[in-house]
């Protein structure tokens, strides 16, 4: 693994400002999320400062492939970009889930080059996740200049990616809000969220929303431990309430694995256009496991009777409900952090292009230092640090396993330390 590089890294020699770039196309690809409009606007505003025109290439990679047949493109002039807000999620440029390598056209890269030449576009700023990044590498290898601005709400790339913080905030909001209906009906509430094979958004959103249990792909589930925690917390919460009211919330990442380490799929969901199985059904699976254990537990029958809830044949165990906020966690508003990061990512993608760089991923900045990574390193999957999970286990959160011990090492920091803001 190479370390993130800055603009003085000899791996990518600086050629000085590349002023043969007169027009830049902007593409947003894959799933939408918060922060993308910030990337679009940051790219356009920096390009304007450099006397470069920018154009939105609509519909992601599908639009790039079809440029040759496109009549005109929207130029992102200062007036045009003033018409949309970086505070809104989604992308003014539009998306599609199309991977260039999947297009069955042997002349597809030449077709793309001809389309770019038609509009005089010299380089591309492309914002997306790992699949998008792999296409950036392909385009670069075919002589198309492009820089990758990392975007994925899943946070499974090596650098921070725009969309992650916005999604975490929305998950936290929904988890917290659902407690009102859960408590009213004394329900066990299961919230299934996006994240694919990494549990970052479930982990961080679940903590911020004060979920009781958080199940992520990095930890195969011990159902006995989940049920032990649920039974203890749920019964205690209701019995200590003067009106016998309480709820128990579980946040489930869609890429959850069973005890054998195999992902849980709803096979009827099929595959997406990138060829990935659609991860669905984890929340439903968890609900089934919990319901089976509640139904087989005589203590639960006694608890229901003691608290005045039990009705033979009608209401014998607590209700277990699965909620899937789905695209609501992508939609709506962009967090302040994603708005800041997205603007910087777009602006510095232009700066990287003007330094003669291509086929790389913007990975961050500090003052006047811009960092980037080899794109193949940047799109390697990054998973939840289980040492951080251990910390939150000490605070009472259940992660579907027996709680580990936590003995931290303590070190003093001095000087100007790195922080979010």
Language model regions located:
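Short glycine/serine/threonine-rich phosphate/pyrophosphate-binding segments
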Residues: 33-43, 64-65, 109-110, 124-137, ...
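C-terminal non-catalytic interaction/assembly regions of soluble proteins
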Residues: 266-421
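Glycine-rich oxoanion-binding loops at beta->alpha junctions
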Residues: 67-124, 131, 162-176
């Amino acid at each position: 693994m190479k370390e993130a590089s800055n603009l003085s890294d000899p791996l990518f020699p600086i050629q000085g400002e590349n002023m043969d770039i007169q027009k830049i196309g902007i593409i947003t690809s894959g799933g939408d999320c918060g922060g993308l409009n910030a990337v679009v606007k940051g790219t356009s505003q920096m390009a304007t400062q450099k006397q470069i025109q920018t154009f939105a290439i609509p519909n992601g990679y599908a639009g790039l492939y079809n440029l040759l047949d496109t009549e005109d493109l929207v130029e992102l002039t200062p007036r045009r970009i003033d018409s949309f807000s970086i505070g809104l999620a989604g992308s003014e440029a539009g998306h599609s889930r199309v991977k260039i390598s999947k297009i069955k056209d042997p002349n597809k890269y030449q077709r793309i080059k001809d389309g770019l030449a038609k509009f005089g576009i010299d380089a591309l700023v492309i914002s997306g996740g790992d699949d998008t990044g792999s296409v950036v590498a392909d385009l670069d290898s075919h002589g198309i200049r492009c820089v990758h601005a990392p975007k994925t709400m899943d946070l499974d790339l090596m650098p921070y990616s725009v969309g992650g913080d916005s999604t975490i905030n929305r998950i936290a909001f929904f988890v917290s809000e659902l407690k009102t209906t859960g408590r009213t009906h004394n329900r066990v509430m299961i919230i299934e969220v996006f994240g694919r094979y990494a549990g970052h958004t479930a982990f961080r959103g679940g903590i911020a929303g004060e979920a009781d249990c958080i199940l992520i792909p990095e930890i195969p589930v011990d159902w006995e431990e989940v049920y032990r925690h649920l039974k203890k917390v749920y019964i205690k919460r209701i019995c200590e309430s003067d009106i016998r009211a309480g709820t128990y919330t579980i946040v489930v990442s869609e890429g959850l694995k069973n005890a054998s380490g195999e992902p849980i799929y709803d096979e009827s969901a099929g595959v997406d256009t990138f060829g990935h199985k659609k991860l669905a059904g984890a929340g439903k699976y968890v609900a089934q496991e919990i319901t089976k254990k509640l139904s087989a537990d005589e203590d639960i029958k006694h608890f229901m009777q003691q608290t005045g809830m039990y009705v033979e044949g009608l209401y014998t165990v607590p209700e277990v409900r699965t909620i899937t906020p789905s695209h609501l966690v992508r939609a709506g508003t962009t967090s302040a952090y994603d708005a800041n990061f997205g603007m910087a990512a777009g602006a510095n993608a232009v700066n990287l292009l003007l330094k003669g760089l291509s086929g790389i991923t913007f990975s961050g900045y500090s003052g006047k230092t811009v960092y980037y990574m080899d794109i193949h390193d940047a799109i390697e999957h990054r998973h939840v640090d289980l040492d951080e999970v251990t910390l939150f286990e000490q605070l009472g959160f259940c992660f579907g396993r027996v709680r580990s011990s936590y003995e931290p090492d303590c070190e003093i920091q001095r000087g100007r330390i790195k922080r979010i803001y």
